[in-house]
């Protein structure tokens, strides 16, 4: 069973595509590739989009069960841990994308392009936690304003801050 996260308005975003194929139309394929070549946790990072028949709204679902919380509603330390983990997973996906996209003539080139597009999203608050598992909504979209660039999840996070500094060892 999937966990509902939120509904997005399509008119507030611009869909990203490669070779005329919208990234969100390839959810099942990219998640299969990610799970096969990386891990189920990597694949769970990518929320499942459900477009309404009129293509005006998108319902987003997590592929894991649990309590869903937007990153903006988490305590600061927990939010930073989630962002760091999301960035780590995203960098692995980006690396796979780069490997597959090296040869523009290969069968994997389009899949590599799609893997890169799933890391693009319009706003920093597109990240959710489902019982600690990072889940990205609104992926495959850029902000609606003409010329506005999407966020790149692979640039999120970084090193988790150390709680206490380790004292240097004195030379004997």
Predicted regions and their residues:
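Cytosolic/nucleoplasmic/matrix-facing N-terminal domains/tails
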Residues: 1-171
């Amino acid at each position: 069973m999937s966990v509902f996260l939120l509904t997005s308005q399509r008119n507030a975003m611009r869909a990203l595509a490669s070779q005329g194929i919208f990234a969100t139309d390839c959810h099942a394929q990219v998640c299969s590739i990610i799970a096969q070549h990386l891990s189920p946790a990597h694949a769970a990072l990518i929320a499942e989009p459900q477009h309404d028949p009129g293509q005006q709204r998108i319902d987003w679902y997590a592929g894991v069960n649990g309590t869903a919380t937007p990153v903006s509603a988490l305590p600061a330390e927990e939010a930073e841990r989630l962002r760091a983990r999301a960035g780590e997973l995203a960098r692995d996906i980006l690396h796979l994308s780069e490997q597959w996209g090296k040869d523009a003539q290969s069968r994997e080139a389009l899949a590599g392009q799609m893997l890169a597009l799933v890391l693009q999203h319009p706003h920093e608050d597109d990240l959710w936690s489902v019982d600690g598992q990072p889940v990205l909504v609104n992926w495959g979209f850029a902000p609606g304003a003409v010329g506005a660039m999407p966020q790149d999840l692979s640039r999120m996070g970084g090193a988790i801050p150390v709680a206490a500094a380790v004292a240097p060892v004195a030379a004997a």
